[in-house]
Amino acid sequence: MSFASETKKELTNLEVKDCCAKAELSALIRMNGSLSFSNRHLVLDVQTENAAIARRIYTLLKKQYDVSVELLVRKKMRLKKNNVYIVRFSENAKLILEELKILGENFVFERNISEELVAKRCCKRSYMRGAFLAGGSVNNPETSSYHLEIFSLYKEHNDSLCALLNEFHLNSKTLERKKGYITYLKEAEKITEFLNVIGAHNSLLRFEDVRIVRDMRNSVNRLVNCETANLNKTIGASLRQVENIKYIDERIGLEALPEKLREIAQLRIDYQEVTLKELGEMVASGKISKSGINHRLRKLDEIAEQLRTGQSITLK
């Protein structure tokens, strides 16, 4: 089961107050519902591919309105051939839609979230939970990027949902997609805050555990890469220095060098793998700083270059 599916399953088991149940139902029906007429009666179908969400809708409807509700199961004939669950009812459908602030006067569909419906902070949380159950998805925290989004068919609803999330300082943003709109979060901290707001506390803990391990692993990898790069740089410089020193020895002999340069040249030949700092600590005449060692090695590089190009040699 995916992380998003586990999160939704957890949410469908939450107990809610009556006012919050209506807010959650409003989001679920508004985003997943469709209306039709049968025998001159208004019929409402709420469709989902998630069995737990279908049971949630069924239970909330029965608890809040005690109406006759059907639960149908169909199988998709294309692509994944998943089951499709349809929660269907016609009894008092218009009145329920009006109470849930989905239908207004004269059978007008309300595309914005009703302020009255989410007047209480607990109801705001519940509407957000219903919206996530209806159209939400969240990446597994083990994947390459953090991303949570909620899909809406209508721009007005998407904008009001984004504003609702931002009442909780979630820094959510909106984006138009091919067949609708999304409200999304990209920051890991904001995703965990959202999970907390909608009541997915177990999923929040799992998300944080995985994120901490992942971030720690990334930090270790960056450190290792940095150390590897520095090591490669050190090895590359050492090989160049040794090559130049050997060239000097072949052309004029190390004995021709001033004592200070000869001493460093011999140490570098003998200890090719050590750093400049370590090399400075090996000088018999006394410890030399890293910059001092670097200066002498650069001087040896210059002498080797002068020999290669036939220039006059400066040994001092």
UniProtKB/Swiss-Prot annotation:
DNA-binding region: 275-309
GO biological process: cell division; regulation of sporulation
Keyword Transmembrane recorded: no
Repeat listed as a keyword: no
Entries under InterPro entries matching the protein: Homing_endonucl (IPR027434), Sporu_reg_WhiA_N_dom (IPR018478), Sporulation_regulator_WhiA (IPR003802), Sporulation_regulator_WhiA_C (IPR023054), WhiA_LAGLIDADG_dom (IPR039518)
Record GO terms (molecular function): DNA binding
Alphabetical UniProt keywords: Cell cycle, Cell division, DNA-binding
Domain of life: Bacteria
S-S bridge residues: none
Its biological purpose: Involved in cell division and chromosome segregation.
Protein family (similarity comment): Belongs to the WhiA family.
Identification of the protein by name: Probable cell division protein WhiA
Organism: Bacillus velezensis (strain DSM 23117 / BGSC 10A6 / LMG 26770 / FZB42)
Lineage, uppermost ranks: Bacteria, Bacillati, Bacillota, Bacilli, Bacillales
Gene, per the UniProt record: whiA
